[in-house]
Regions:
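Alpha-helical structural motif
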Residues: 4, 24, 31, 35, ...
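Generic structural signal for hydrophobic core residues of well-folded globular domains
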Residues: 12, 39-42, 77, 81-86
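Conserved short "hinge" loops at termini or chain/domain junctions
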Residues: 1-68, 135-156
Length: 156
């Protein structure tokens, strides 16, 4: 995991997290993993192993790219989902504004949405080419991609 449960303390107080999850650490881990998967769905053209690592592999692969803004986005998303579950002494509107700033949508573009649309280009590695496929995926994920049909000769 890119974000540990103890790192959510920058977004929510520990006693608030314990009140929401009823002292169940599995609930916090579940929300963090869901937030990471949510971010991965936006960042499909980048090398997700370099950004997030792989905790399902043996041995575990650590992320090679360190980006604090990506970590902050995951923390905001996980915190927002925790607060939506139950919000003891937490202003939900403040978390909604943070969520819109970090994620966004078509009407209110946020950081992740702008990366997906190509408006922001972070200094992250693109997904490597898969040698088992005929197409070069690393070239298609670049900012500019073009192709054409084969030239054909017409005879009458």
């Amino acid at each position: 995991m890119l974000v540990l449960p103890s790192e959510l303390n920058t977004e929510l107080y520990p006693e608030v997290i314990e009140a929401i999850t009823r002292s169940n650490p599995d609930e916090t881990i579940s929300q963090i993993k869901a937030a990471e998967d949510f971010c991965k769905s936006y960042l499909f053209k980048y090398d997700l192993i370099a950004l997030f690592g792989n905790d399902k592999a043996d041995p575990v692969v650590s992320p090679t790219v360190k980006d604090e803004n990506l970590k902050k986005t995951i923390k905001v998303i996980a915190s927002y989902w925790l607060v939506r579950k139950a919000s003891p002494n937490v202003n939900l509107d403040l978390f909604r504004e943070d969520f819109e700033l970090m994620v966004g949508n078509k009407e209110i573009p946020g950081w992740l949405y702008d990366i997906k649309e190509g408006n922001i280009s972070p200094d992250w590695p693109y997904k490597p080419d898969n040698p088992d496929t005929p197409e070069d995926e690393s070239a298609t994920n670049d900012g500019v991609h073009w192709s054409s049909n084969q030239k054909r000769t017409q005879r009458f």
